[in-house]
Amino acid sequence: MKSMIGMSLLLGLSVMSADASADEALARSKGCLGCHGIEKGIVGPAYKDVAKKYAGQNVADQLAQKVVKGGGGVWGGMAMPPNNVTPEEAKTLVQWVLSLK
């Protein structure tokens, strides 16, 4: 029984890790990581800083709109341009960013 629980936990963690890798690959393929680092900001803020700022807030839909349409004024003078992503991709990216610790 204990081994079944352990295997289930390991399988769940590997699936979560695969999802996170796929989400990071999406961010990379869409050019997001050219301006945003995970740990450190480049032109835009670091994704971990974004996750920390919005922790516990219900802002995923609002942030996804900013990813699609662009926006500024929250992190300094440089506005984020509109991005060539679908609304579904934007939601996936935002959920990934907000999950970072």
Short names for language-model regions:
Residues 53, 57-58, 62-65:
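Post-signal/leader-peptide non-cytosolic segments of secretory proteins
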Residues 34, 42-52, 66-95, 100:
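Axial heme c-ligation environment in periplasmic c-type cytochrome domains
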Residues 1, 21-24, 101:
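Absolute protein N-terminus
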Residues 2-10:
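Sec-dependent signal peptide recognition
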Residues 5, 24, 64:
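Short glycine-/small-residue-rich flexible loop motifs, especially phosphate/cofactor-binding loops
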Residues 21-38:
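Sequence/structural segment immediately N-terminal to covalent heme-attachment motifs in c-type
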Residues 15-18:
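N-terminal signal peptide c-region/cleavage motif recognized by signal peptidases
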